[in-house]
């Protein structure tokens, strides 16, 4: 008799995706981040659901409802901080996942990669609207500054901003719709993640060497299920260390002050995971130019397959490209640091140089280096 998991219509899908899936035998821990992102998403949806039961999306009561969750709701504080720090873990996993894709040439799977870039944009949008909900000072001013960037769009900009605000400033209508967006977007992310997996399973996973591994496959279960569970335990450990010992480490103290439209904080800055893009935005003195640079800094990922000039897929055997990759990582860390600094000398010039280097590495240096490596190998 055939096993039920291979015949039942629903079980068959699960079986083909997580149990009998043929996987390369040599994929490293860098391949864990996909499943960790799935865990993060489930965790965020669950904690978010319980927070939504007590949260009120009204400008008068939003801040106090979050305070009420932390003080009066049973284990409300842990749910709130798991949700806030869970977002940080989500982005750490996202950056690792994208970095792995760049290093090992995963972007050659075009559909999977492009859906991934759309997912990245969607997660960033979700995190942004979510940050507005506690209605603290940084929530309010962050929403005002970032939505205002759309006014740089020629002709329709101002109308577009007022349409998003639902009025002439960030107010009750804005908060209510941002709560609605924040509630629906994670389910859209879940649907997109399924499409992401669907396209991935059409081609099968890449492996560190970049060489096809059709002749050397192993079943996903038990090998990679166990490996994923280990990753999950480490993720939960790190998250709970943050939540229980330093819940506000990654947050902004200004967000513990209720939103006040009459008082601007001295340094308006987003959460840490947006600082690299914020630094690129600020490094250009022109508003429209800054917005274009901001969008390009993420959208540039879509160009990766076009910029791949190497005859090898992975960077595993390409030492010069490896050096460039790690310089790019260091550059992104520098941008993250600059994004959190005030707009003054020497931070302005460092930010501008780091922004130029970011685009230079991806658009010029990496393709040129790959071509040089091809010639060195006499290919």
Swiss-Prot record:
Residue numbers binding heme b b566: 97, 196
Transmembrane segments: 33-53, 77-98, 113-133, 178-198, 226-246, 288-308, 320-340, 347-367
Membrane-protein topology: Multi-pass membrane protein
Cofactor list: heme b
Chain positions recorded as a ubiquinone binding sites: 201
Keywords on record: Electron transport, Heme, Iron, Membrane, Metal-binding, Mitochondrion, Mitochondrion inner membrane, Respiratory chain, Transmembrane, Transmembrane helix, Transport, Ubiquinone
Keyword Transmembrane: yes
Keyword match Transit peptide: no
Cofactor: binding comment: Binds 2 heme b groups non-covalently.
One term under GO cellular component: respiratory chain complex III
Subcellular location as annotated: Mitochondrion inner membrane
InterPro entries with a match to the protein in the record: Cyt_b/b6_C, Cyt_b/b6_C_sf, Cyt_b/b6_N, Cytb/b6-like_sf, Cytochrome_b, Cytochrome_b_C_euk/bac, Cytochrome_b_N_euk/bac, Di-haem_cyt_TM
Chain residues that bind heme b b562: 83, 182
GO MF entry, a single one: ubiquinol-cytochrome-c reductase activity
Biological process according to GO: mitochondrial electron transport, ubiquinol to cytochrome c
Function: Component of the ubiquinol-cytochrome c reductase complex (complex III or cytochrome b-c1 complex) that is part of the mitochondrial respiratory chain. The b-c1 complex mediates electron transfer from ubiquinol to cytochrome c. Contributes to the generation of a proton gradient across the mitochondrial membrane that is then used for ATP synthesis.
Record family assignment: Belongs to the cytochrome b family.
Subunit structure: The cytochrome bc1 complex contains 11 subunits: 3 respiratory subunits (MT-CYB, CYC1 and UQCRFS1), 2 core proteins (UQCRC1 and UQCRC2) and 6 low-molecular weight proteins (UQCRH/QCR6, UQCRB/QCR7, UQCRQ/QCR8, UQCR10/QCR9, UQCR11/QCR10 and a cleavage product of UQCRFS1). This cytochrome bc1 complex then forms a dimer.
PANTHER family attached to this UniProt entry: CYTOCHROME B (PTHR19271:SF16)
Miscellaneous comment in the UniProt entry for this protein: Heme 1 (or BL or b562) is low-potential and absorbs at about 562 nm, and heme 2 (or BH or b566) is high-potential and absorbs at about 566 nm.
Protein name stated in the entry: Cytochrome b
Organism from which the protein derives: Elaphurus davidianus (Pere David's deer)
């Amino acid at each position: 008799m055939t096993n039920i998991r291979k015949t039942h219509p629903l079980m068959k899908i699960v079986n083909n995706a997580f149990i009998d899936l043929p996987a390369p035998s040599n994929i490293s821990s860098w391949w864990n981040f996909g499943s960790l992102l799935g865990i993060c998403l489930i965790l965020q949806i669950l904690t978010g659901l319980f927070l939504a039961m007590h949260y009120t999306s009204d400008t008068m009561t939003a801040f106090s409802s979050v305070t009420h969750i932390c003080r009066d709701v049973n284990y409300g504080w842990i749910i709130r901080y798991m949700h806030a720090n869970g977002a940080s873990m989500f982005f750490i996993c996202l950056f690792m996942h994208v970095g792995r894709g760049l290093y090992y040439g995963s972007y050659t799977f075009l559909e999977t990669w492009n859906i991934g870039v759309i997912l990245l944009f969607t997660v960033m949008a979700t995190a942004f609207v979510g940050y507005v909900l506690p209605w603290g000072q940084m929530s309010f001013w962050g929403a005002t500054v970032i939505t205002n960037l759309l006014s740089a769009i020629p002709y329709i900009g101002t109308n577009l901003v007022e349409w998003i605000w639902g009025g002439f400033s960030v107010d009750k209508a804005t908060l209510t719709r941002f709560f609605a967006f924040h509630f629906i977007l994670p389910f859209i992310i879940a649907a997109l993640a399924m499409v992401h997996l669907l396209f991935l399973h059409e081609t099968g996973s890449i492996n560190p060497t970049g060489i096809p591994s059709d002749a050397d496959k192993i079943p996903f279960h038990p090998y990679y299920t166990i490996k994923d569970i280990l990753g999950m335990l480490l993720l939960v450990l790190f998250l709970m260390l943050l939540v229980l010992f330093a819940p506000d480490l990654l947050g902004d103290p200004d967000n513990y002050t209720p939103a006040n439209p009459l008082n601007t904080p001295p340094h308006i800055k987003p959460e840490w995971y947006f600082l690299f893009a914020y630094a690129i935005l600020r490094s250009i003195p022109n508003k429209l130019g800054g917005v274009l640079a901001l969008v390009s800094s993420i959208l540039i990922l879509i160009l990766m397959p076009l910029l791949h000039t190497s005859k090898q897929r992975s960077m595993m055997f390409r030492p010069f490209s490896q050096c460039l990759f790690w310089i790019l990582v260091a550059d992104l860390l520098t941008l993250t640091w600059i994004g959190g600094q005030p707009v003054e000398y020497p931070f302005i010039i460092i930010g501008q140089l780091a922004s130029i280097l970011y685009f230079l590495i991806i658009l010029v240096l990496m393709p040129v280096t790959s071509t040089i490596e091809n010639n060195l190998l006499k290919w």
